Amino acid sequence: MNSIEKDSYFCSKVSQLRQEVNRDAIEHILLEILDYVITHYALKFPNGTLRLLELEIYYRGANYAGESTHGDELQTNRCGKLYDHRKGGTRKGFDVVLSQGKDYYLSCLVKGTVCEDEVLFKQGMSYDKCQAFAGVENLSEYKPIALAPLDEPTIGPVLHSKRIGLTNESDKDAILRSLNCSYLEPQSKDFNLLYKYKGYQKTEFFKAEMKLRRVNPQQATDLSKLLLGYVEKASIAEFFNQAGSQD
């Protein structure tokens, strides 16, 4: 596979994204890009690799306001490179930049990674490991392209939900967060630890997946058993009540 900036599928999706004007369609394309990156790429350094467990995607362009995007020029025209969130503060976080031009912002916030057999749940844990591999204090100063193709794409399911902690009214309900279950089974101990740390519920993934998959009642029941280990009747009823009111 080619590097990300020469990946024909990725480039075609970004081109499609830039030309679309419908907000729902734009967010659908963003989710396609996000899922492609999380299943086909990793962060590779001379002395180690971070596989992508959990990502959120952010975009701002002429066709999409994307108010929750930082809007830093380092999030533009640096496809495959890293963007460090810190500007003298203590909050740790970094993006993988996907923008190939100076007139739009496109990047993925790295929420979780896997290093060898260690699951790095906390955003800061992934930051520290990435910083150690990159050998720089500020990840924006790491010059090589860090995003590199996997030898083989992952084949496990990818789950989705809303991005975490957003308050902007136009951004907060968009389903633009992905979790790669090739590295983390839904019923595993590690999966439950993820939720214990982050303080949100597995039902958020379940609700988003019902919406994205447009499930019927039986499919909703089966999906609930798969993701939650039980039938989440309240969420299923709420989903179909809302669907009925929109018909």
Question: Predicted segments — roles?
Answer:
Residues 1-247:
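A cross-family signal for N-terminal binding/gating loops and helix N-caps
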